[in-house]
Amino acid sequence: AMIKTSRLETGVISLEQKQQPVYDTLAAALGGILLNAEKKQIDVQVECPEHLDARHDRKWTSEALFNILDNAVKYTPAGGQIHVSVEGWEMYVKIDIADTGIGISEQHQGTIFKRFYREDAVHDVDGIGIGLYLAREIVTLQGGYIWVVSEVGKGSTFSVFLLRK
């Protein structure tokens, strides 16, 4: 993750945005988390139209979505749920990743996207605090944005907005 972040920031990596289905990009991201979700008996549900396109770089956007999904698995207790839903808006495609995890306090919701940030409550969970930073950088470089709504003890919903055209 560190090398990817460095390459992205220095412009070594260029994002190749093209009009393509979000379905395939999301499927690649989900492929990276399903085994760990299964180990924790987390129910992963996905609602995504097959033919909904957005202008994005498939490889890097998949990486961004994976980072958010990976956190959802890490911070959702065994037996919990992750629900992914995708819908087309006029200018954006909105991808919601909702979990029944530990949640993020309101005071920390603005800082979770900072590089190396880790909330004190999660220091026993593996990670270096760069996944959400990298996810936001990737999405922002493509003209999109990420929004989070969370409640401690109830879970979080990360909304990723990608430009349709």
What are these regions (language model features)?
Residues E16-P21, E38, D43-D53:
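Conserved catalytic submotifs in the C-terminal HATPase_c
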Residues L35, I102-G103:
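Glycine-rich G1-box
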Residues G131-A135:
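Short alpha-helical Gxxx[C/S/T] motif in the catalytic ATP-binding
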